[in-house]
Amino acid sequence: MPLKDLPLDAQPREKLLARGPAALSDAELLAILLRTGLAGKGVLQLAQELLDDPVRDSATGRSAGGGFGGIAGLLHASSQDLQRIKGLGPAKRAELMAVLELARRALAQQLREREVFDSPQAVQHYLQLHLAGRTHEVFAVLFLDSGNRLIAMEELFRGTLTQTSVYPREVVLRALHHHAAAVVLAHNHPSGSVQPSRADEALTQTLKAALALVDVRVLDHVIVAPGAALSMAEQGLV
């Protein structure tokens, strides 16, 4: 149904202005960005289809169509990923990518201005924006100063859907480069599960021991997936 055929108070833009953004669904917020749909497909339907779960190839686990699995997956999509969606021209793709970058910068600014563990949820959201939509495993590190504020984030290793090789020596060298006092380790699980594996637990302890040799503390190891995040520290695994 075209937006103009909806009652005025049900149209996303008017609803946002009257009741605030929290009153809108993800699809309604996205529809405001998209503005128009396609022939035979209203903008709300297009927005919902973009947010639907992806269809994955059973053999490779890679996306074979469908949506992006929610806001985090959509906003992490590359320009090439967005090009496959009929109706998303260059202007709409640019707007979506700009929104993602603004969200990243806002979260990074928050982390730099206060102690990271004053808001562990902000850390998890920041990592989800960076890692949750990836179709391959990525291992990243947040380097922190003595006040637990963010110095930098680096993606250090990439792997297949099932394995990422992580070299402790490289993590130690990057920590020394940034003069970090502490780190938060992070990686994604493209499978969608955030439960840590035995390999995740072993890697955490290996890196913790290596970084302790240069007086750098491991504060947490966060695992992210589309729509979810898990703190290994909160599970007693760090």
UniProtKB/Swiss-Prot annotation:
A motif (JAMM motif) lies at residues 187-200. The keyword ATP-binding does not apply. CDD domains: MPN_DUF2466. The keyword Signal does not apply. GO terms for biological process: proteolysis. Keywords: Hydrolase, Metal-binding, Metalloprotease, Protease, Zinc. Residues 116-238 form the MPN domain. Zn(2+) binds at residues 187, 189, 200. NCBIfam families: PRK00024.1, radc. This is UPF0758 protein Ajs_3450. It comes from Acidovorax sp. (strain JS42).
